[in-house]
């Protein structure tokens, strides 16, 4: 299962380096190319709420094998694609399979291990998953420099087949099946809500925030999610049991996770764009720059897990966010002559900060939930993280695009001429990226402030959970 999650994560990270080249090959804008990432995260965000139902309805073995087969189908479609719409379709099919894997893996960990050992277990999972971003950009860079981009997908096919074969032979079931009826109305509301909301954020990059298309999409999305939330809170068999938010540490860490995820995913988009589009570095050089930080991050994850089991998440989160914010400040004054070594050091520092807080924050919230809500809590946590990543990426690309345009107009109005237009475009792009990093710092500060309120709490028993939910239902009626 960890190997399957590794492949899904690897597939997601290789696109950050490939985006600039795909923009040229398909003659598309950054806002359009961003859909390869946003669309992937969007499908994850739509599908993951349903995984809580899937994890109860199907066995671990059935669900994992089905998700890997879907992922394989999407990989094949992406590999043979010759147009951007076909490539995007393949990516979304991949996302449908990948969206099931991580919630399923997390749920298995929380089923097998007691609360006082989950940090170390999640740390080992984190090591395997973080190793994918460590080699993903470098591997993608090497392929793009020496071969065609299609090889990134063709190369994944045999490994996915091996995971399916090994899963079929060795994977055992660890959860009990619960036969329940799927709430189709909830599925429709969830799909419309997350789909239109993310579409609105993505279109804002090219259409602007005053566009009626953007405003209507966001309004429809928020309305549908409001109806979805109401239905989950009043249903006897909710698709996604939102009563998990009645547990204070789960709610708090979920909000912090939103901020942390937006900071992490946005940087995965901005730095490759700066390196390749503004500085002229190759895809391989861009990937190599990200390699040291990702390797250090992967190495620290198991250590962080053990520290969490011993000390809790509060100070790991605070220290991690402080390091992340300080090193992100180093990215707000980039120029066309910023040294490669400086970028490596700042990027590595950001990854160290991320390693200290990612798994502890998620594990701290899920640890409080009773066993009956673990699957729902896992699905909620992963849904929000995926949506936050997509919204964060869309928001930061919007900021970068709009600020780049503003800076370019200012340069032209202060004596710029057509002869130096190419240089001004590069300079305006760099300044737009700097402005986007300022927004990242602001989001990180919100997460830092909230981290001071994290407390170490134990898992709520099923008896206490039942009493708490009964009180909630009485209030609702």
Show which residues each predicted segment covers:
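Short, membrane-exposed interhelical loops at transmembrane-helix boundaries
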Residues: 412-432
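Phenylalanine-glycine-rich, low-complexity intrinsically disordered regions
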Residues: 173-176, 191-214, 229-234
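Helix-loop junctions on the cytosolic side of multi-pass membrane transporters
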Residues: 165-186, 207, 230-239, 402, ...
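12-transmembrane solute porter fold
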Residues: 1-10, 15-19, 26-31, 36-37, ...
């Amino acid at each position: 299962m960890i190997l399957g999650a590794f492949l899904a994560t690897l597939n997601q990270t290789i696109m950050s380096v490939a985006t600039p080249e795909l923009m040229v090959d398909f003659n598309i804008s950054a806002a359009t190319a961003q859909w390869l990432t946003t669309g992937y995260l969007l499908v994850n965000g739509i599908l993951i709420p349903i995984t809580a139902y899937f994890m109860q309805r199907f066995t671990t073995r059935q669900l994992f094998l089905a998700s890997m087969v879907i992922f394989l189908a999407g990989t094949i479609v992406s590999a043979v694609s010759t147009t951007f719409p076909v490539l995007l379709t393949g990516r979304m099919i991949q996302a449908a399979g990948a969206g099931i894997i991580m919630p399923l893996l997390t749920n298995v960990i929380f089923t097998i291990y007691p609360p006082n050992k989950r940090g170390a277990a999640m740390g080992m999972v984190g090591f395997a998953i973080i190793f994918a971003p460590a080699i993903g950009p470098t591997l993608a860079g090497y392929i793009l420099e020496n071969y065609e981009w299609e090889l990134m997908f063709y190369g994944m096919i045999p490994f996915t087949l091996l995971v399916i074969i090994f899963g079929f032979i060795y994977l055992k079931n660890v959860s009990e099946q619960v036969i329940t009826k799927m709430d189709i109305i909830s599925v429709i509301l969830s799909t419309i809500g997350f789909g239109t909301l993310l579409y609105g954020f993505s279109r804002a990059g090219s259409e602007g925030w005053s566009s009626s298309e953007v405003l209507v999409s966001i309004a429809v999305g928020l309305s549908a999610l409001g109806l979805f939330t109401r239905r989950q809170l009043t249903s006897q068999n909710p698709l996604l049991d939102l009563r998990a938010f009645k547990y204070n540490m789960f709610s708090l860490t979920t909000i912090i996770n939103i901020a942390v995820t937006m900071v992490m995913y946005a940087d995965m988009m901005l730095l490759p764009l700066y390196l390749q589009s503004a500085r002229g570095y190759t895809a391989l050089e861009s990937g190599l720059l990200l390699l040291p930080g990702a390797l250090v991050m992967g190495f620290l994850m198991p250590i962080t897990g053990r520290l969490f089991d011993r000390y809790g998440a509060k100070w790991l989160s605070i220290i991690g966010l402080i390091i992340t914010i300080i090193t992100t400040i180093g990215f707000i004054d980039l120029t066309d002559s910023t040294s490669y070594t400086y970028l490596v050091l700042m990027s590595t520092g950001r990854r160290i900060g991320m390693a200290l807080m990612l798994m502890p924050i998620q594990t701290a919230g899920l640890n409080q939930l009773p066993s009956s809500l673990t699957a729902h809590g896992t699905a909620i946590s992963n849904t929000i993280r995926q949506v936050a990543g997509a919204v964060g990426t869309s928001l930061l690309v919007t900021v970068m695009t709009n600020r780049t345009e503003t800076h370019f107009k200012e340069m032209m109005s202060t004596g710029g001429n057509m002869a130096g237009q190419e240089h001004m475009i590069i300079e305006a792009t760099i300044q737009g990226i700097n402005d986007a990093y300022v927004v990242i710092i602001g989001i990180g500060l919100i997460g830092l402030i909230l981290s001071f309120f994290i407390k170490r709490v134990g898992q709520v028993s099923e008896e206490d959970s039942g009493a708490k939910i009964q009180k909630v239902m009485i209030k609702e009626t």
